[in-house]
Amino acid sequence: MKVLFLHGLESKPGGTKAIALKEAGYEVLNPALPKKPFDIAVKIAQDVINYEKPSVIVGSSRGGAVAMAVDPKGADLVLIAPAWKKYGVSKKIESAFILHSESDDIVPFKDTQELFRNNRGLQVISCNDDHRMRKEETLNAIIDCVNSCSV
């Protein structure tokens, strides 16, 4: 199954979460997203979606905002500490898994709570981690969410 992984602002392709997904057996599409401008990152992601047709889109931090800004073309969403508010992305999404930590020092957990209040199709998973979301149990939770999407 194809999974599009959209990395965060200070990350790059081939990071911990993308590697974990690949090791779990997924075909991981992991394009390099520029730091600026945001709309170019969205265009790159949309082009990959249009051409590769991934089944699941996983976005981390800024990549989560990018994932919320694209037309997923039927792909399921898994958002990791999505920085939607910082990038002015719409608060309306039909359904998604969101993994976030109340200890996040970059993207406030209250932003995820606000998303949940406005979108009842969301499943929020609170992780005992920091913003980087690299602990083994967090990586396993991300993989579990992607596995749930593939059912």
PLM feature spans:
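Catalytic histidine neighborhood in serine/cysteine hydrolases
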Residues: 117-134
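Post-His helix in hydrolase/transferase enzymes
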Residues: 42-43, 111, 134-149
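Short beta-strand/loop motif that positions the catalytic acidic residue
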Residues: 97-104
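Active-site catalytic motif of lipid deacylating hydrolases and related acyltransferases
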Residues: 1-52
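Conserved alpha/beta-hydrolase "acid-adjacent" motif
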Residues: 14, 105-114, 134
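Gly/Ala-rich beta-loop-alpha elbow adjacent to hydrolase catalytic centers
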Residues: 57-68
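A conserved short beta-strand
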Residues: 73-85
